[in-house]
Amino acid sequence: MNYSFNFFTPTQLLFGSGRLEELKEVAPKYGSKCLLVSRPLEGSLKIIYQRVEKLLNSVNVEVVFFDEIIPNPTIEGIEKGVIAAVKNQVDFVLGVGGGSVMDSAKLIALLHHPGGEINWEKALISYNHPFNYVASKQYTLPFIAVSTTSGTGSQCTQAAVI
């Protein structure tokens, strides 16, 4: 059995009680407009979304909500997110939620293209193995994750499931 592989995770993880406030320092480094990717803006998480929006607005970062993420995300959902990012000319993507949100937000950031179209055949060939390093493409957007669950660890890896 071959136990040889590469694992690349350029992730900075800020963990601990009260650390959400640091979003005010981190986010502006990536621009002044973000696409906040989430589940529908309802229920108990709505308070978190409002808090994140208030934090970002306090440092002059505009928030564009994309709240169409469903469990087990679909290609169609990712396409809608990319279109929202392009239409609103965002500078970075912020995922707030659990694994499905993180996976969707990562793919929206990765597959972002000014024309809004996604070449799925090329994407699935280029990004088909989580242990291979593939350089970011020209239009990839920065990605920030605010995890609200402790399940999949999607906020820490380069892999995404759709």
Question: PLM features: what roles do these ranges have?
Answer:
Residues 76-162:
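Glycine/threonine-rich beta-strand-loop-alpha-helix active-site module
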